[in-house]
Amino acid sequence: MIREASPADAAEAAALLNEVVLPTTISFRHEEWSAAEMDARIRRLAVTGRATFVALRDGRVVGFASYDQFRGGSGYATAMEHSVALRPEARGTGLGRALIDAVAAHAAKGGARTLWAGVSGENEAGRAFHARCGFEEIARLPGPGFKFGRPLDLVLMRRALV
């Protein structure tokens, strides 16, 4: 089941990201998410008309997705960037696609024209997943990320919403 996240989901969402993201190069983030930080993110996105979604299985958060404006400034008001993460047991179940589709529908309803993904160059599964969800690879930036003592490429992928 996919639903919009609430502050009550903050601790579980933070734990999911800490388990899935921190030990990998899926994201370049080095710091653990706290429940308070996630709570603030969920609230901030809701106030700005953006959204955070969770995927539930047996009442447990097994997936997370959110989106926000791609870059600051009014010239980017119709370009959104998302993040998505799934626990290993939720991969291949359709929940990831459902999260992406929920983000895309919400963003389009708010006037977004494009949805962007910044995928680690090492994350072949993530790039393939996004391609299956209608994203196309636009550019590969060499080395803007850094984690585990090495530079990491960033692949920009885009999905048209209109």
Each predicted region: which residue ranges?
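Hydrophobic adenine-recognition pocket in adenosine-nucleotide-binding enzymes
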Residues: 5, 86, 119
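Helix-loop element at the rim of GNAT/NAT acetyltransferase active sites that forms part
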Residues: 15-32, 45
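Conserved active-site tyrosine of GNAT-family acetyltransferases
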Residues: 59, 130, 135, 157
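Conserved GNAT acetyl-CoA-binding A-motif
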Residues: 107-119
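A short beta-loop-alpha structural element at the N-terminal edge
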Residues: 1-15
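Acetyl-CoA-dependent GNAT
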Residues: 30-89, 100-101, 160-161
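Conserved acetyl-CoA-binding loop-helix of GNAT-fold acetyltransferases
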Residues: 92-105, 127-132
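Conserved catalytic-core motifs of GNAT/GCN5-like acyltransferases
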Residues: 66-69, 74, 116-119, 136-153
